Amino acid sequence: MGSAAELTEPTTGTEKLHQPIEVEEDDEQIVDLERKTFRHGKGHDTSVDSSTITNTSSSSSSSFSGDGGTEETPDFHSNGDGEHTDLVNLEVPELETEIVFHQEHDDGKNCIVFFDGEQGSESAGAIPDAHEESQTADLNGEQTQLEPENGSTSEDNERSREIEEVLDGDVSKDLDAVDPLAGEVIEEEVDFEDVEYHDVENMMDKQETHDLYCPNCDSCITKKVILKRRKRKIRRHELGDSKRPHLTEPLFHSEDNLPSLDGGENSANESFVFKCLSCFTIFIPKGVSSKPIPPRQGVEGLKIQPNPQVEATGDSNWFSSIFGLNKKESAIQQGGASSSVLEANPPPRESIVPVVNPSRGNLSPMRKDTTGSAVVQPDAATSIQVAKSNDTSEIVNNGAIVGDGQKFLAPMVEEQTQQKIDNDDSSTADGNHTSDKGRLSPIQPSHGMSILNTVTNGPDGLKVETTIHEEGAPLLFEGKDTPDTSTADFGLTKVTGVMDTGDRGVITGPANPEIDISAGNLLEEGSLREPLMRRVVVQGRKLEILKSIVYGGLLEAITSLGVISSAAGSGASMLNILVLGLANLLGGLILIIHNLQELREEEPIRTTTEDNQTNGREEEEGRYKRLLGRRENFTLHATVAILSFIITGILPPVVYYFSFSEKHNKDYKVASVFGASLFCIVLLAIAKAHVRYPRGSYLKSILYYGSIAVSVSGISYVVGNFLEQLLEKHGWSDGSETPVGQMMLSSLMGRKAGFGYSSSY
C-alpha cells in the first residue's frame, strides 16, 4: 500500500530507531509538524505554542515514540471551541525550532525535509552555533538516519518532549500530561478570555445597596436628619415587663419602650428615627426596599404599627374576633393605657397610605379611603403619634389637647380604657392632613404635667372634658389666658376621630368611621387623672419663694383690712384700732404656723396603675407641692410665708395710726388704709396668677381678689358703724370711747348703765 519511514532523533552518539509511521497512499497527507520551544514565564500565554500538533486531512492515526518507547503527552483541556490549552510554566531551555515536512512525492517516494523555525529557510547544512545535522533521504522507502555533527544535541534529547495528538476527523481527544523534570514545580494557570478583574474590597466599601425613600415626597431620606429620642426610665417592679404586655390587658406605652426590631444587632438603632427634610415627616427605620415608594397623599406623622405578637394578615378570622372567640385581640400600644379594638365595617378603599411596620423590615402600604380615613390591616395594633412645631395650633391626643408651643409624641397614659369597635375588615384610624404646619418633633418629658378627664353622662351620650394641668409650673402654653380644655363627645354609638390640622383649633374627622362602644366598657362618671408625657419644668427657688409670699400674705392682707375697717366703722380710737390690729396679727401667726405644719404632714396623692403600683415620686401630687413647691425646702417656705404674713397683716393698722395724724379725720384714715391694702392685694393677685398652673389670666385674678377685698372692707365698715349706732340707741354707750363690754359688765354688777349722766335728765 504505502511505504514506511523511520525517524531517528539526535542522541548522545547513539541512534535509536523509532516506530515507522504508517501512511496510506492517496488518503493521508501530513501537512505540518511544528515544534516550538518557549521560555519559562508566569502569566504568559503560551498554551498554543507549547505543543506539537499534527494535523491530518482525514481520519488517520500517527504516533511518535520517545526514548525507550514510552509515550509522554501533556494534559490538554479543551475550551469548547476546538482549541487546546496546555500547561504554561514548563521550564524548557531555549531551543531552535525545526519544521519537518513529510511528504509523499508524485513518484511514490517519501522524503523528509527539515526547516529552521526562526529563519524560515531550509536547512541543508550546518546550523549556526548549535549543531550540524546530516540528512539522508531514502527515496526507496528505507530508513533515513540523522547523525549529529557534535555532542550538543544530547541536551536537546533530554529536555525535549514528544507530543502525540490523534485526530479522528475534527474531534480531538484528551492527552496525558508530560512528566516534569525532577525538582521542578509546575504552576497551572488557565487563561480565560474576556475576564475583567476588579478590586472587590474597594467595591464593597463604596457600594450602597439600598436607600430609604420618603413615601410622601419621593426624596432619599437615608442621609437626611436623624433624631435621637431619650429613653424613658420605667421601674420594672412597678410596671412589670414593659416589652411584653399581656394580650388580655394591653397597655399604652411610649414608642421608646418598644422592643428592638431585629434583636440585639439593631438594639443600638432602636432610639433613632428618620426625618425627611422635604416634607418633615418622621419615620421609624424598619428595613429597606428595593424600589422607591411613590409619593402619596397621606397623613404626616401618622404611624400605625402592628403588634409584633399578632401579625396583620388578610385571612384573619374576623367573625371569631367579633364574638370574642379569638382571644388575641389587637392592642393599641401607646403610653400606659390601651384600647382593645375589634373591627368596623368600612366600604372598600382604593388609595394607599404608607405604614411603618416594625416587624417586617420595610415600609408597607396600607389602604386609605378618599375621605382621609386610614384603614389598618386586621389584627394590627395601632399607635398614633402626634406632635407639632412652635405654631399656634392644638393637638388632640387621647382626649387631651396640647396647645401653643407644646410638642409631644405618644403620651404615657396609665388609665386603661377599653373600647369595643365593630369592624368588618379592619380597624380605622382618622388620618386627614389639611395643612403643612403640624410637624413631628420629639420633646423632653416634664415632671408635673398631667391631664384631668371629667366624664359626664348626659342625654346626648358620654361626654369627656379634658384639662391639662402641671403642678408647680408656670404657664405651659404661652399667650393663653385660660386653661386648655377640650370636650370629646363620644355620643351613644360613635366617636368622631380627632386630628391635628396645624391650624388653631380642633377639627373632627368625618363621620366615617363609626366606633361602637359597649356599655360595659364605658367609663363611669367622675374624674380620671392621667399623667401625660411630661415636659421638663425647672422650678427654682424664685418660683417657690413667690409661692410662699402668696400663700402667707394674700389672705392675711384681706383679713387685716376687714378688721381695721370694722374697728374704724365702730368709732374706736386710733390706739384701740392699732392694738386690735396687732392682736389679730399675733393670733393669725399662730394659726399660719399650724397650717404650714399640717400641710407638710399631709400625705401626697400618687397616681396608681391597675396593679396598685405607684409610679414613683415624680408623679406625686398634693396641696403642698401645688401651693409651696418641693417638700425638702420646707424651712425656706415657712420662713418666707411667715414674713409675708406679718408684713401684710401689720400694714393696715400701722397706716391707719400714722396717716393724717394731725387732722384725726377718720374717713381719710380709712381711705388711706383701703388704698394701701388694695395695692398690696393686687400685687399678690398677680403673683398668684403667675405661679398658678395652668397659668390663669392676670386680669381675672386681679378682679377676683380685688372684689373680695372691697367687699370685705366695705361690709366690715358698714357692720361696725351699724353696731355702734345700735348700742348707742339702746343706751349701752354714753358716747365715750369706753368699750361696750365694760359697760355691760358694770350693768351686771348692779350699777345702772349711764348712772353718772342721770342728773342731766
From Swiss-Prot:
Residues 74-85 have a biased composition (Basic and acidic residues). It is a multi-pass membrane protein. It comes from the Eukaryota. Residues 1-85, 120-162, 338-374, 416-448 are annotated as: Disordered. Residues 136-154, 416-432 have a biased composition (Polar residues). The chain crosses the membrane at residues 549-569, 573-593, 640-660, 670-690, 702-722. Induction: Not induced by NAI1. Keywords: Coiled coil, Endoplasmic reticulum, Membrane, Transmembrane, Transmembrane helix. Disulfide bonds: none annotated. Residues 48-65 have a biased composition (Low complexity). One of its GO terms (cellular component) is plasma membrane. InterPro entries: ER_body_metal_sequester. Residues 186-206 form a coiled coil. Residues 22-31 have a biased composition (Acidic residues). It is found in: Endoplasmic reticulum membrane. Signal peptide: none annotated. Not essential for the accumulation of ER body components, including PYK10. PANTHER family: MEMBRANE PROTEIN OF ER BODY-LIKE PROTEIN (PTHR38937), MEMBRANE PROTEIN OF ER BODY-LIKE PROTEIN ISOFORM X1 (PTHR38937:SF2). Belongs to the CCC1 family. This is Membrane protein of ER body-like protein. It comes from Arabidopsis thaliana.
